[in-house]
Structures are given as structure tokens and as C-alpha cells.
Amino acid sequence: TYSVKVPKDYVAWGKGDLLNPAAVLTPATAPRLKESYTSDKIMHIATLDEMMQHKVTVQNDFNVWKFKANDITDVCYGVSKNYVWDASSTIVDPKTNRRASMQAAYNDTAEDFKHYVEWGVHALKYFSTEWPGVPYPFVKMTSFQGYADMEYPMMVNDSHTDNMQFSQMVQDHEMAHTYFPFYMGINETRYAYMDEGWATTFEYLIGQEEVGKEQADKTYKNFRIRKYISDPSAEEDQPIISMSTQVSGAGYGNNSYGKASLSYLALKDLLGDELFKKALHHYMDVWHGKHPIPWDYFNAMSAGAGQNLN
């Protein structure tokens, strides 16, 4: 449980459940947020006009926004007094009909962010039922427009671009980090290839559904692989198993993203989708929250596949 104290008219977007919506949101705004938790439609919780006309938050000098989140490794939040607020939700566990909230907070001039809830709902469904095919483990995901592209448990901080496909790909990538490193508890500083490599792989796989295989292949090759295969420096081509803290520059990027992702896709091709997913689920089930290291991944995938993959 944590609290964010901000002046009136500032909205705080944080990870976890908002515990006191009636204490910080106006009687017109709070019901919209509540409705969004059970609705498939994309709703404007707060428009720019409403934000500018002081119609969104309770008009105390300061408001204290209280949040509660379970099973998280980090806390972050974003605040603004002029961001648009959209929300929807979707079923992420078909067996239990459990839903997750998808929200976005952004500058009204950012055209790509106007699609972020729509794209995010699709990503939540895909990651929950296709790849990795594990129900989204949290109650909410919020995309906040910022000045970097960075993942946090239940939140992503994304920069605005004019390229719609690229913006969707970036959001997909950051949301995929829900599983690696957060769900698994991976040490991303030491083993970046164990989280960035998977996020890159899931970004590519969901991209095939969003823009078609031909375009997804082209983007993957140009954005994730080309720098690696055209790098003339042998010194930068270090083994993927190298600790991420021991490589830098292009070598770090190659190992963490493209090379690692290619290794996962190669194993997927070797085993076939069904057996690969079985092995992946075994790895995730056994090591969820237990901070696996590379050898845990190797052994768990071999055990899950029923083969010696060394």
C-alpha cells in the first residue's frame, strides 16, 4: 500500500488498485472509472476540457491517492493536471473470467496515445491466451506518456511518436515485460537477455497478428537484427551468457535484444509451437517469483520438453 499526495486538479496514476476513488475524484468521474473495470468499451474517464475546467478531482488543496498492489518488485506512478485519461478492461483469464483494467494517460496532442487503450486491450488478451499464454497476473496496466520507453510492474512509460506501428510495437514490448522480468523475478541488470530477449520475442509474435507476418518480419530484421549482423566489431560479439554488466554499447544491445530473441525463436522452431509452449509454461510455473538464472532456464526448458536440449 502506498499514497501519492498531490495538489487539486492533479490526477495520480499508479500501479495497483485505487483504494479511495470517491475521496479524490468528483461524483461525475468516479463512476466512469468504476464502470470501466467491467466494460469492454473504451471510455474517457477525463477529457482535456474536464481537466482544464477543474471537473475531475475533488477540490481540496491536496488530495491523497491511495493504491494497493500485490506481488510487485517496484513502485512507480505518474501525475498530471492536463493529461487525458482513457480506460477499458478485458478478460485475461477465460477460465475464471477475471478481468484486468487497461488505462492510458497522455497529452491530447499525442495521436498515437489515443489508440493506446485499444492496443493495450489487444495485447493483454494476446499475452494471456497466445504467447506466452499465461493469464496477465495483475489487476491493471497503465500506459503513461513520458520521455522514455521503460517498463514497470503494471505501468509503462512511453514516449510519443508519429509512427503508429512503431508506437504499438513499443507498447507491446513494454507490456510483455510483465512476464519477464516481473512475473519471474529475473535480475535484469545481470541477465538482460532473460527479460529483453523474451519481450523482443513476444513483440515480434504479437506483431505478426497486428500487421501481418511479412511486415513483422521486416520490422524485426531491421530494428532488432540488422545492427547485430552488420556490426564489424568482433569485440562486441560476446557470448549471450556474458553477464550484462560486463558488456556495453552495441554489444549490450545485441546480446540483450536481437541475439537473445533469435535463440528463443530457434528453440521454438526446433521443438514446434506445442512442445515449446509446454516447456515454456513449465519454466514459468516452476520459477515464477523465484529469480531464475540462465541455468535454471536451461534445465527447466529441458525438463518441460522432456529432452536434453544441451
Task: Please tell me what each predicted stretch does.
Residues 95-100, 147-151, 169-179, 228-244, ...:
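Active-site-adjacent bridging/hinge elements
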Residues 253-310:
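Amphipathic alpha-helical substructures
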Residues 1-172, 201:
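Hydrophobic helix-coil surface modules that form long, contiguous segments used
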Residues 106-115, 161, 188-189, 250-253, ...:
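Second-shell loop/turn segments in exported
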Residues 157-221, 280:
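Zinc-dependent metallopeptidase catalytic helix centered on the HExxH motif
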Residues 196-262, 270-271:
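Acidic/His/Gly-enriched intrinsically disordered linker/tail segments
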Residues 11-15, 133-140, 187-188, 210-219, ...:
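Acidic/polar loop patches that form or flank catalytic/metal-binding clefts of enzymes
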Residues 141-142, 162-166, 242-252, 265, ...:
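Active-site-adjacent structural elements in folded domains
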